[in-house]
């Protein structure tokens, strides 16, 4: 991740011209701020950012003659910053009045000082050498003194604000605007005391030479008056900039490596949010002595020395001036701690005054202005007592007095952004203004220490010809200070330079009465950092902003509005070796930089991307992911297109054909039963090779008993294991046969070997009859017997012994081929001899037979049905391996009071008349002492589907066919008009007859299937805005909650899509669209749980899971939720009055439920209702409920052929598993033994969808992008496998046998809702 984070504030931005990359004078007129995140890492999760837009009144003018000289140093210390994943931004505003006049100030960053250019009418004072200019004719003369040991200066803002700065082994800076007044004095060894007096105001810096240590006797110390003449109350205009400017400089560091970018004023507070409610801004009581408050316009500077002031006398002075009722908290700050400062509003007119004295320990500030406004306060101290060096007349020191009058008629300046900072690493002592207007010093001792500037301050506003830049730099490893760089760029630099040479200018400044303001909390936002893009410096930055809803700090806060930000990561550049060394030094021990890009990655990242081909557009979805839209073909893709990749029509057709081929391979599970009426007809049997027949003949016996030549399970298990080990990776995948008679047929498509001679054919055999014999009944009900061996019939029941010899003879004759007689004889014995053994393991009423090609199938005489699936797989492994059980597998009679019945869909269930309850499990299997645990209910999707097809009856009062004539170029629009034009939806149940314009042909099913493919690609295309890709991948869909903004008739289109989906299900066709799991649950009217969110949005899921498992009270969450729409964030209440309800342990489950309902149900309720209205017009709602959400996906989208070779090749193993591990070998053996349905169900269990990407498992997606299928060792053999759908990971315990793995895996797949198997 890039180390620099760029934040842009869009406060009425008018120009967006790029800035120079070097710090100079060529600044634009906008607000900028750069915060460089340090590589020094801690363990915090929140970085608090405060933005404080302020405004104060425009001050009138005061003239003075000064001469400026200054020097200053800012000590440095090590900054310790915290690692963050979220920015918490707090806003602190002030009431605004007036507007900012056009004025410009220019500063040179190369000069080690802060330059402030003043105009006529703006007060400025500087430093003179050991002299104090007198006041003549009522004009103000400021006389600060400065020598080698003490430095100070005064700086003013561009609109009449007054600030001062002086430092020597202690730094102080104070900046205000709009007439607000602050004063700061820092001295190396001087101390000042001021006697109380009325109508006095400190108007200048009073430092002294630290080496002279002079003192002024009390008899010579008279108040220094500073008179103000209201000579002009005219507004401050732009023309005044052209003459009468004063330059003052504040020292800054030269070593700043951050280029000038477009930023705004921000301050980062690396501390947790406030837990103590701040005092009311209108309260007259004092602040608490301790507590953590959100700051408001405050600098804290570490004290040089804490003074004792207990007995009313002071040996060491402390001075801080506040204006208009600004109250400073009396407290001692810990490093990084910031106190709250609020303006004190009082009635009546107070006059500001500061009383100076030599023998009093108190410094007082009284205010008598009825119009108060807040300002910046600087906390600092002085160390030793020193005398005031001033110019005297006739041996007397006559400091002047000044009375400042406030005029409420003056014009004001509006400052849009304002920052504050915290600095000290030692204890700080603040002054507090009591209700009498006195500034009291705390009774604490100040320790000697350097003042450290730890953050930067800047003023800015989005106004013409004014810009402000604040650059914040961290030098953690070398202990360097944060650097302050404030620049005011004027539109006419030449005139400024000429005027800056004149150091003696007369300035007049009038302070007027300002209206009452209050400094209140605007709100705070949490900004996620993970989806932020990285900026390319070679390209023009797209100024796309996001609006974040302002949240309250506590339940008593009332906030409203948005914070608009544009944030990007600054790209890493190939910096010097010193920069890399600094980054290495700044890392704390124990931290390692991961995913460090190499030089090639750097070069690739810095390469300028090629322009998009014509007709392409770059966009971003709601998750910040970039995708590209092809307006010519109306397609979207994730990969950036290039002119070389611009596909021709033929290549596009090939891709379309490939997608269609993948779609056509999907099928319904019982398609073969719909077209085949006579199963026993010889021409309907499928030709199958020996390897397939061998694999399926007795797959239920993987656990071999002791060696026996007639043991079929032993031979099959050994052969299957050998093939998995030897030929598993080299087998060639072949397409499935066009005659899909069995769902199990697709499971062997990945393994094709050399043709082998077929096994001896064992013809259909009835139970209790010799092989090849079958019992049938004639029309009168008489039984007769058919000998398929000789193709004869007889009324006499044949004996078993006579037919065994015939079977052996037939087997040896039919096995003639390249194999030896010995192997032929063995093969014949393997098939013919264990007939009773095979049937002995079958359940009661079942029989196994073989097709002419040797493929076994099973007959259930209880229900008179046949199946390719071995029913023995449904018996627990420990039962299958026990030969001591009865050969008929008869578990005995049912317990007393029980009854066995068959459901309407063919499933067997049991009735307990004792307690009047029903269940699917056989009660005889509940006797653990005899048979072990009960067999869980297995969802038989095939039976459900067949029952569903039987219930769908065609109505008689509809036409024979439903015709549609369409154009391929406008298939969506033509289909919409034709289908929605049908008033009676039953007409859509007629046979489909589709013709494409300009094409001749008869539609006997193939054209309709192609139409469903084409219409699916159009309906579910995110280009039209009706659907969008889910958060986890780019092939599962969800309804776009903002579809109404893309299409006014979106509800009509959703009804159309519902009708098309119903037509596909009714006619047995498929849709090429896969939805998220909550979509299918909503169709079935099932409740959506927290587990369903994991596969859709893992970040959201983890947040809600944390709330469920922890106490959310400290998060200060409300029953509200934010939604982003086109860059703006909107706020929705989850319940009435939700913004006032705090989420606690008692109501957190309700909160999670409401969040899930809003996320999946409420936002798309209208769209989903329209879709279900169209769907249920063709499919009965009660009939569809026999399926679960996974089976409903198979019903709508069909079963696909899973390439096991590709699946296995792109699977990863973790935590001790490897490709050669025994459990992994058993796992893939189980996958091979599964039919297509079971494989799809396994895929759904692990990944959440039955669809495999077009290019195979290599492009399988997870919640964080491409994520391969993973099998990880976890748990103990007693546990069931579990899945993580967001990571495509299967947690597989190390089972001790294949039978145990098979049982547990089947149970997990079939009963995912019955246990916590997916998390």
UniProtKB/Swiss-Prot annotation:
SMART domains: HECTc, WW. The active site is at 1286 (glycyl thioester intermediate). It catalyses: S-ubiquitinyl-[E2 ubiquitin-conjugating enzyme]-L-cysteine + [acceptor protein]-L-lysine = [E2 ubiquitin-conjugating enzyme]-L-cysteine + N(6)-ubiquitinyl-[acceptor protein]-L-lysine. Residues 204-229, 755-780, 796-834 are annotated as: Disordered. It is an enzyme of class 2 (transferase). It is found in: Cytoplasm; Nucleus; Cell membrane. It is a peripheral membrane protein. CDD domains: HECTc (cd00078), WW (cd00201). There is a cross-link at residue 1279 (Glycyl lysine isopeptide (Lys-Gly) (interchain with G-Cter in ubiquitin)). It holds the Pfam family HECT. Its EC number is 2.3.2.26. Keywords: Acetylation, Cell membrane, Cytoplasm, Host-virus interaction, Isopeptide bond, Membrane, Neurogenesis, Nucleus, Phosphoprotein, Repeat, Transferase, Ubl conjugation, Ubl conjugation pathway. Residues 207-229, 796-809 have a biased composition (Polar residues). Residues 810-825 have a biased composition (Low complexity). Undergoes 'Lys-29'-linked auto-ubiquitination at Lys-1279 and serves as a scaffold for recruiting USP13 to form an NEDD4-USP13 deubiquitination complex. Pathway: Protein modification; protein ubiquitination. GO terms for molecular function: beta-2 adrenergic receptor binding; channel inhibitor activity; enzyme binding; ionotropic glutamate receptor binding; phosphoserine residue binding; phosphothreonine residue binding; potassium channel inhibitor activity; proline-rich region binding. Residues 578-981 are annotated as: Mediates interaction with TNIK. Binds, in vitro, through the WW2 and WW3 domains, to neural isoforms of ENAH that contain the PPSY motif. Interacts with BEAN1, LITAF, RNF11, WBP1, WBP2, PMEPAI and PRRG2. Interacts with NDFIP1 and NDFIP2; this interaction activates the E3 ubiquitin-protein ligase and may induce its recruitment to exosomes. Interacts with UBE2D2. Interaction with PTEN is questionable according to PubMed:18562292. Interacts (via C2 domain) with GRB10 (via SH2 domain). Interacts with ERBB4. A cysteine residue is required for ubiquitin-thioester formation. WW domains are involved in recognizing PPxY motifs in substrate proteins. The WW domains mediate interaction with LITAF, RNF11, WBP1, WBP2, PMEPAI, NDFIP1 and PRRG2. This is E3 ubiquitin-protein ligase NEDD4. It comes from Homo sapiens. The gene is NEDD4.
């Amino acid at each position: 991740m890039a180390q620099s984070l760029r934040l842009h504030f869009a406060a009425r931005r008018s120009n967006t011209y790029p800035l120079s990359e070097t710090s100079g004078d060529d600044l634009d007129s906008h607000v900028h701020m750069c915060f460089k995140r340090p590589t020094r890492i801690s363990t915090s999760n929140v970085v608090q950012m405060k933005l404080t837009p302020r405004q104060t009144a425009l001050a009138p003018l005061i003239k003075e003659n000064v001469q400026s000289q200054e020097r200053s140093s800012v000590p440095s210390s090590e900054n310790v910053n915290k690692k963050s994943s979220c920015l918490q931004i707090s806003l602190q505003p002030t009431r605004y009045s007036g507007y900012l006049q056009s004025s410009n100030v220019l500063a040179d960053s190369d000069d080690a000082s802060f330059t402030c250019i003043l105009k006529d009418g703006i007060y400025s004072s500087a430093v003179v050498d050991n002299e104090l200019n007198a006041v003549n004719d009522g004009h103000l003369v400021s006389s600060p003194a400065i020598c080698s040991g003490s430095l100070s200066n005064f700086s003013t803002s561009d609109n009449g604000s007054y600030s001062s700065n002086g430092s020597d082994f202690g730094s102080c800076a104070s900046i205000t605007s709009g007439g607000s007044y602050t004063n700061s004095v820092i001295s190396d060894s001087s101390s000042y005391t001021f006697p109380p007096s009325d109508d006095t105001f400190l108007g200048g810096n009073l430092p002294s030479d630290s080496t002279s240590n002079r003192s002024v006797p009390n008899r010579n110390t008279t108040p220094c008056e500073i008179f103000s003449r209201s000579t002009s109350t005219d507004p401050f205009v732009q023309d005044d900039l052209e003459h009468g400017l004063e330059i003052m400089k504040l020292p800054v560091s030269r070593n700043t490596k951050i280029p000038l970018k477009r930023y705004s004023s921000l301050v980062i507070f690396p501390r947790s949010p406030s837990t103590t409610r701040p005092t009311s801004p209108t309260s007259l009581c004092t602040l608490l002595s301790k507590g953590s408050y959100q700051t408001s316009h405050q600098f804290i500077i570490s004290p040089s020395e804490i003074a004792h002031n207990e007995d009313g006398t002071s040996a060491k002075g402390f001075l801080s001036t506040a204006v208009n009722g600004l109250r400073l908290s009396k407290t001692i700050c810990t490093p990084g701690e910031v106190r709250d400062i609020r303006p004190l509003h009082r009635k009546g007119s107070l006059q500001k005054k500061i009383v100076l004295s030599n023998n009093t320990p108190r410094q007082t500030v009284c205010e008598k202005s009825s119009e108060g406004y807040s300002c910046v306060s600087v906390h600092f101290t002085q160390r030793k007592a020193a005398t005031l060096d001033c110019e005297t007349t006739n041996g007397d020191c006559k400091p002047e007095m000044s009375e400042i009058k406030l005029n409420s008629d003056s014009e004001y300046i509006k400052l849009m952004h304002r920052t504050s900072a915290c600095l000290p690493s030692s204890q700080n002592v603040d002054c507090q203004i009591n209700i009498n207007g006195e500034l009291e010093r705390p009774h604490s001792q100040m320790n000697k220490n350097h003042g450290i500037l730890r953050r930067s301050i800047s003023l800015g506003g989005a106004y013409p010809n004014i810009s402000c830049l604040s650059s914040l730099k961290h030098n953690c490893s070398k202990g360097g200070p944060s650097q302050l760089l404030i620049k005011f760029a004027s539109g006419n630099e030449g005139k400024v330079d000429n005027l800056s040479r004149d150091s003696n200018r007369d300035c007049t400044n009038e302070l007027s009465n300002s209206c009452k303001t209050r400094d209140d909390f605007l709100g705070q936002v949490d900004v996620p950092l993970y989806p932020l893009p990285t900026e390319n410096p070679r390209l023009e930055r797209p100024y796309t902003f996001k609006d974040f809803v302002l949240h309250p700090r506590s339940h008593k806060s009332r906030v409203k509005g948005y914070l608009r930000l544009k944030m990007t990561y600054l790209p890493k550049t190939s910096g010097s070796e010193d920069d890399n060394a600094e980054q290495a030094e700044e890392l704390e021990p124990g931290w390692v930089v991961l995913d460090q890009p190499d030089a090639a990655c750097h070069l690739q990242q810095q390469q300028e991307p090629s322009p998009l081909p014509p007709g392409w557009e770059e966009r971003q979805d709601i998750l910040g992911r970039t995708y590209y839209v092809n307006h010519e073909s109306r397609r979207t893709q994730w990969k950036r297109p290039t002119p070389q990749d611009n596909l021709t029509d033929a290549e596009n057709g090939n891709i379309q054909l490939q997608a269609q081929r993948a779609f056509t391979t999907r099928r319904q599970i019982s398609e073969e039963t719909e077209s085949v009426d006579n199963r026993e007809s010889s021409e309907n049997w499928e030709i199958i090779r020996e390897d397939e027949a061998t694999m399926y003949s007795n797959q239920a016996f993987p656990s071999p008993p002791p060696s026996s030549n007639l043991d079929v399970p032993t031979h099959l298990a050994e052969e299957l294991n050998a093939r998995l080990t030897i030929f598993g990776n080299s087998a060639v995948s072949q397409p499935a046969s066009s005659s899909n008679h069995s769902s199990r047929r697709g499971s062997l498509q990945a393994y094709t070997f050399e043709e082998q001679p077929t096994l001896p054919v064992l013809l259909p055999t009835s139970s209790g009859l010799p092989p090849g014999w079958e019992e049938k009944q004639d029309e009168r009900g008489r039984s007769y017997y058919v000998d398929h061996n000789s193709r004869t019939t007889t009324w006499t029941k044949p004996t078993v012994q006579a037919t065994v010899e015939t079977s052996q003879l037939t087997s040896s004759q039919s096995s003639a081929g390249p194999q030896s007689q010995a192997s032929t004889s063995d093969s014949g014995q393997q098939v013919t001899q264990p007939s009773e053994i095979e049937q002995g393991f079958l359940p009661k009423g079942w029989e196994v037979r073989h097709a002419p090609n040797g493929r076994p199938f099973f007959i259930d005489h209880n229900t008179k049905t046949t199946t390719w699936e071995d029913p023995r797989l449904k018996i627990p492994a420990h039962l299958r391996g026990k030969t001591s059980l009865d050969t008929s597998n008869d578990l005995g009679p049912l317990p007393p009071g029980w009854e066995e019945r068959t459901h309407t869909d063919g499933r067997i269930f049991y009735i307990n008349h004792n307690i009047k309850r029903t269940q699917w499990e056989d009660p005889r299997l509940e006797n653990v002492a005899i048979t072990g645990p009960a067999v869980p209910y297995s969802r038989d999707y095939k039976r459900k589907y067949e029952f569903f097809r039987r219930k769908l009856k065609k109505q008689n009062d509809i036409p024979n066919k439903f015709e549609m004539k369409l154009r391929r170029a406008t298939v969506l629009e033509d289909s919409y008009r034709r289908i929605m034009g049908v008033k009676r939806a039953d007409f859509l149940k007629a046979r489909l007859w589709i013709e494409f314009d300009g094409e001749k042909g008869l539609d006997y099913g193939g054209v309709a299937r192609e139409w469903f493919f084409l219409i699916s690609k159009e309906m579910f295309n995110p280009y039209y805005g009706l659907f969008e890709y889910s958060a986890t991948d780019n092939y599962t869909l969800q309804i776009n909650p903002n579809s109404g903004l893309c299409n006014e008739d979106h509800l009509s289109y959703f009804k159309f899509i519902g009708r098309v989906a119903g037509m596909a299900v009714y006619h047995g066709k498929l849709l090429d669209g896969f939805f998220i799991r909550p979509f299918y649950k909503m169709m079935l009217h099932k409740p959506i749980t927290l587990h369903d969110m994991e596969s859709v949005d893992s970040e959201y899921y983890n947040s809600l899971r944390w709330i469920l498992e922890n106490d959310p009270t400290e998060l200060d969450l409300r029953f509200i939720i934010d939604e982003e729409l086109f860059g703006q964030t909107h706020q929705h209440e989850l319940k009435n009055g939700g913004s006032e309800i705090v989420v606690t342990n008692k109501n957190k489950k309700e909160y999670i439920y409401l969040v899930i309902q809003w996320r999946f149900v409420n936002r798309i309720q209208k769209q989903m209702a329209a879709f279900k209205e169209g769907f249920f017009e063709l499919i009965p709602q009660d009939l569809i409920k026999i399926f679960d959400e996974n089976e409903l996906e198979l019903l709508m989208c069909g079963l696909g052929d899973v390439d096991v070779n590709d699946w296995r090749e792109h699977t990863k193993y973790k935590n001790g598993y490897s490709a050669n591990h025994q459990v992994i070998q058993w796992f893939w053996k189980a996958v091979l033994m599964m039919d297509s349905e079971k494989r799809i169900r396994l895929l759904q269990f692990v990944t959440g969808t039955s669809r495999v990407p077009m290019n195979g498992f290599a492009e399988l997606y997870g919640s964080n992008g491409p994520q391969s299928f993973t099998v990880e060792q976890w748990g103990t053999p007693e546990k069931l496998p579990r899945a993580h759908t967001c990571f495509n990971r299967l947690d597989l315990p190390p089972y001790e046998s294949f039978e145990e793995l098979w049982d547990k895996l089947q149970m997990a797949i079939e009963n995912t809702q019955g246990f916590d198997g997916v998390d």
